[in-house]
């Protein structure tokens, strides 16, 4: 678990992962300052913490396909959003991760 997740005391369960969406620029290309209501949700996020994992039919632990610190692509509307200490996070299932960005 990352230092950030440890200090927040958030531990996802099962095959869920905790991610933090990347911030969208607050200024448009033309220099116009965008209000929060005009910003769209980003589909890129950093993996902050991993859950305990999923088990197969024989009880063997299946490895996660991502690691803490990876930048992943998730659907804009997936997961459970939560705010902790003023920071916004999303808990998503591993199956909701579309890709790992290299």
UniProtKB/Swiss-Prot annotation:
GO terms for molecular function: ATP binding; metal ion binding; protein folding chaperone; protein-folding chaperone binding; unfolded protein binding. Gene3D superfamilies: GroES chaperonin (2.30.33.40). CDD domains: cpn10. InterPro entries: Chaperonin_GroES, Chaperonin_GroES_sf, Chaprnonin_Cpn10_CS, GroES-like_sf. Keywords: Chaperone, Cytoplasm. GO terms for biological process: chaperone cofactor-dependent protein refolding. The keyword Transcription does not apply. HAMAP family: CH10. Belongs to the GroES chaperonin family. Heptamer of 7 subunits arranged in a ring. Interacts with the chaperonin GroEL. Together with the chaperonin GroEL, plays an essential role in assisting protein folding. The GroEL-GroES system forms a nano-cage that allows encapsulation of the non-native substrate proteins and provides a physical environment optimized to promote and accelerate protein folding. GroES binds to the apical surface of the GroEL ring, thereby capping the opening of the GroEL channel. This is Co-chaperonin GroES. It comes from Chlamydia trachomatis serovar L2 (strain ATCC VR-902B / DSM 19102 / 434/Bu).
């Amino acid at each position: 678990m990352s230092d950030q997740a440890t200090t927040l005391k958030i531990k996802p369960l099962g095959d869920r992962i905790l991610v933090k969406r990347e911030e969208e620029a607050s200024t448009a290309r033309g220099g116009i300052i965008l209000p929060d209501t005009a910003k769209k949700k980003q589909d890129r996020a950093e993996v902050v913490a991993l859950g305990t994992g999923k088990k197969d039919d024989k009880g063997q632990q299946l490895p996660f396909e991502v690691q803490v610190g990876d930048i992943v692509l998730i659907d804009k509307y997936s997961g459970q959003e939560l705010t902790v200490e003023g920071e916004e996070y999303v808990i998503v299932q591993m199956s909701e991760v579309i890709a790992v960005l290299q």
